[in-house]
C-alpha cells in the first residue's frame, strides 16, 4: 500500500518489457516523466528553443590598429580596434549571428562635459560602422545612443548645477543618432533614458531621409548594480560622479516599466528592450504579454561576469549555465538577447546541430 494525502493507494504488479521480475507500481494514468524519458522525446515537446537568430553580439571598440585588450572584469571579452572588429563581424556572420552592437572606449583626451565626440562623424563608432558595412553589408549593426562613453563626468546627459538636463541632452542625442545612421548603422538604440528622445530621434532620422533606420529603445532600463564591468569596459567607471537614479528606473517598479515601454512605442520605437536581463525576467514577460512588440533583453556585463567568474573557478558548468541563462530569456518572452556569450553560444548551438 502507498499513502497519498493520508489515503492508501493500491500498488499493482507490472511486468517489465525486458522480462525482469515484476515490480509494484502506482495505478497512475498520467505520468509526466514519460515525455522526459529520452532526448528525442524531450525535443518533441520542448516549448522554447534558442537559435543563433536570437543573439546580438556586443563589441567594445578602442582606437588604434591590430589591437585587442582584455577587459579584466569581463573574462574572455576584449576591446577591439576597428580592423579587429571587422574580423569579429566576419566571425559573427560565419556563426549566423544576425547583428552586432558597438560600444566605444573613448580616450580621456576626447571626453568633455558635453560629450562632443559623440557627434563627431568620424568618431570611433562611425569608423567601425563604415568599415564593417563596407566588408559585410549584410550583417546588422546596432549603435548605442548615449553620452556616457563621451562625457568627462560619466553621465548619459548634459549637466547643469548637478542636475541632468533632459531636453538639452535630447538635442545632442539626435545629432549623435544622425552621424551613426549616416555612417551606415542599421539600428539606433538610445540607452540614455531621457524623456522624449525616441520621438525626437525618429523625427530627426525621417527628416534626414533615413526612414528605414530602426530604433530599438532601451525602454525599461533600470539603475542597476550589474553595469559595473561595462563601465570599466568603456572607461567611465572612474569618471562617473554620483549615480543615475534620476533618469534610470527604480528596480522596485514594473508598472512604471510598462508606462515607459508604451511611451517609446507611441514615439516610434520599432523594438523595445529591458535592461538588465536575468534579474528582470518578470518585466520581460509583462512587456511581451502587454504589447506583443519585438522585445529584447540585455544580459549585461555583471550577469556575464558572474557566470564567467564562477565557471573560471570551477564552481559551475560554464557552458550549461550560459545556455540555461540564454534560454531563460526566450522562456520569459524575449525575441532576442544582447549577450557577450553570443559567439560562444553560437558555437555551442552549431555543435548541437
From Swiss-Prot:
UniProt cofactor(s): Mg(2+)
What InterPro entries does the record point to? Answer: ALAD, ALAD_AS, Aldolase_TIM
Task: Tell me which residues bind 5-aminolevulinate 2.
Answer: 301, 340
GO annotation, biological process: heme biosynthetic process; protoporphyrinogen IX biosynthetic process
The answer to keyword Acetylation applying to this record is no
Q: Which catalysed reactions does the entry list for this protein? A: 2 5-aminolevulinate = porphobilinogen + 2 H2O + H(+)
Q: Which pathway features in its UniProt record?
A: Porphyrin-containing compound metabolism; protoporphyrin-IX biosynthesis; coproporphyrinogen-III from 5-aminolevulinate: step 1/4
For this protein, the record's Pfam families field holds: ALAD
Q: Which PROSITE patterns match?
A: D_ALA_DEHYDRATASE (PS00169)
User: Where does the signal peptide begin and end?
Assistant: none
Sites binding Mg(2+) sit at 260
Asked if Magnesium is a keyword of the record, the answer is yes
| Enzyme Commission numbers on file | 4.2.1.24
Q: Which GO terms describe its molecular function?
A: porphobilinogen synthase activity; zinc ion binding
Give me the Gene Ontology terms describing cellular component.
cytosol
Task: Provide the residue positions that the database annotates as binding 5-aminolevulinate 1.
Answer: 231, 244
Q: Recite the UniProt keywords alphabetically.
A: Heme biosynthesis, Lyase, Magnesium, Metal-binding, Porphyrin biosynthesis
**Active-site positions, per UniProt?**
221, 275
Concerning SMART domains, the annotation shows: ALAD (SM01004)
State the oligomer form and interacting partners: Homooctamer.
Q: Name the job this protein performs.
A: Catalyzes an early step in the biosynthesis of tetrapyrroles. Binds two molecules of 5-aminolevulinate per subunit, each at a distinct site, and catalyzes their condensation to form porphobilinogen. Required for nodule development.
Q: Which family does it belong to?
A: Belongs to the ALAD family.
This protein's name: Delta-aminolevulinic acid dehydratase
Amino acid at each position: 500500500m502507498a499513502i497519498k494525502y493520508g489515503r492508501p493507494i493500491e500498488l499493482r504488479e507490472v511486468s517489465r518489457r525486458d522480462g525482469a521480475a515484476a515490480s509494484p507500481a502506482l495505478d497512475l494514468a498520467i505520468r509526466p516523466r514519460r515525455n522526459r524519458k529520452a532526448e528525442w522525446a524531450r525535443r518533441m515537446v520542448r516549448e522554447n528553443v534558442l537559435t543563433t537568430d536570437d543573439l546580438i553580439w556586443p563589441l567594445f571598440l578602442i582606437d588604434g590598429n591590430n589591437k585587442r585588450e582584455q577587459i579584466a572584469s569581463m573574462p574572455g571579452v576584449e576591446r577591439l580596434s576597428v580592423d579587429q572588429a571587422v574580423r569579429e563581424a566576419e566571425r559573427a556572420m560565419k556563426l549566423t549571428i544576425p547583428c552586432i552592437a558597438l560600444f566605444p572606449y573613448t580616450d580621456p583626451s576626447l571626453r568633455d562635459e558635453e560629450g562632443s565626440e559623440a557627434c563627431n562623424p568620424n568618431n570611433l563608432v562611425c569608423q567601425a560602422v563604415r568599415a564593417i558595412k563596407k566588408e559585410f553589408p549584410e550583417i546588422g549593426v546596432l549603435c548605442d545612443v548615449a553620452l556616457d562613453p563621451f562625457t568627462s563626468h560619466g553621465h548619459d546627459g548634459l549637466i547643469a548645477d548637478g542636475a541632468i538636463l533632459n531636453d538639452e541632452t535630447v538635442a545632442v542625442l539626435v545629432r549623435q543618432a544622425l552621424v551613426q545612421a549616416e555612417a551606415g548603422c542599421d539600428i539606433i538604440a538610445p540607452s540614455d533614458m531621457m524623456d522624449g528622445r525616441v520621438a525626437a530621434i525618429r523625427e530627426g532620422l525621417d527628416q534626414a531621409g533615413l526612414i528605414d533606420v530602426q530604433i530599438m529603445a532601451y525602454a525599461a532600463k533600470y539603475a542597476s548594480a550589474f553595469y559595473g564591468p561595462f563601465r570599466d569596459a568603456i572607461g567611465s567607471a572612474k569618471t562617473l560622479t554620483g549615480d543615475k537614479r534620476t533618469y534610470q528606473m527604480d528596480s522596485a517598479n514594473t508598472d512604471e516599466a510598462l508606462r515607459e515601454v508604451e511611451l517609446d512605442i507611441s514615439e516610434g520605437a520599432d523594438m523595445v528592450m529591458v535592461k538588465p536581463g536575468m534579474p528582470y525576467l518578470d518585466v520581460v514577460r509583462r512587456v511581451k504579454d502587454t504589447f506583443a512588440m519585438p522585445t529584447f533583453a540585455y544580459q549585461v556585463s555583471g550577469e556575464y561576469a558572474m557566470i564567467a567568474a564562477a565557471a573560471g573557478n570551477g564552481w559551475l558548468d560554464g557552458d550549461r549555465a550560459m545556455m540555461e541563462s540564454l534560454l531563460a530569456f526566450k522562456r520569459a518572452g524575449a525575441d532576442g538577447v544582447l549577450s557577450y556569450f553570443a559567439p560562444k553560444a553560437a558555437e555551442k548551438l552549431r555543435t548541437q546541430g
